[in-house]
A protein has these predicted regions:
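Solvent-exposed loop/turn and edge beta-strand elements of beta-rich ligand-binding domains
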Residues: 1-148
Length: 148
C-alpha cells in the first residue's frame, strides 16, 4: 500500500503515518471488525462515501483515545510517499501527522483502505496507491483578543 501526501505535485517529506488493521474481509467483500477494533460500536455495512469518511474519523478517535498500537509506523520520503508492505487482506485505517510549510498546516484526514480493492477493470487489486485529503488552515502569529 502506497500513501501519497502532498500538494500541487510536491510531496511532503518526513511526515509520520500509522496504519491499523481494523477488519477482516470475506470472500463476498463484507467486513468484520478484528483485533483491538472488534468491540467498537460501529457499522461497516451499506456506507456512502461520507459514511466511510465519518467511520474513519470515528475509528481514528477511538485509536487515539484508547492508545492503540499501530501495525506499522513509517515516514514519507522526499517524494511524499510512504509504502506499507507485508499487509494481509483486510480493511485498514491510515492516519498521518500534520505537516507545516510557509505558515500553513496540512493535516491529512484519516482514511480507510481495503486490501484488495476493486480495480477499474473489475478485478481485485492488491497494490493500492492512495492520496491523502487534507485540511490546510492558515497559521497566524497574531493573537485574537476577545472583548470581555
Amino acid at each position: 500500500l502506497t500513501v501519497y501526501f502532498g500538494k500541487n505535485g510536491e510531496g511532503f517529506a518526513d511526515v509520520e503515518f500509522s496504519i491499523y488493521r481494523i477488519a477482516e474481509i470475506s470472500q463476498d467483500g463484507s467486513y468484520t471488525l478484528t483485533g483491538d477494533f472488534k468491540n467498537y460500536p460501529v457499522n461497516l455495512e451499506n456506507l456512502t462515501s461520507s459514511g466511510w469518511r465519518a467511520l474513519a474519523q470515528t475509528l481514528d478517535a477511538y485509536a487515539a483515545r484508547d492508545h492503540l498500537q499501530p501495525l506499522q509506523v513509517k515516514k514519507t520520503g522526499q517524494d511524499g510517499q510512504v509504502v506499507f508492505s507485508g499487509l494481509s487482506t483486510g480493511l485498514y485505517l491510515v492516519k498521518g501527522e500534520q505537516y507545516e510549510e510557509e505558515g500553513h498546516i496540512y493535516k491529512p484526514e484519516a482514511m480507510l483502505v481495503s486490501l484488495p480493492a476493486l480495480s477499474e477493470d473489475g478485478g481485485w487489486s492488491y497494490h493500492q496507491k492512495v492520496y491523502c485529503k487534507f485540511d490546510s488552515p492558515e497559521t497566524s502569529s497574531e493573537f485574537v483578543h476577545r472583548k470581555e
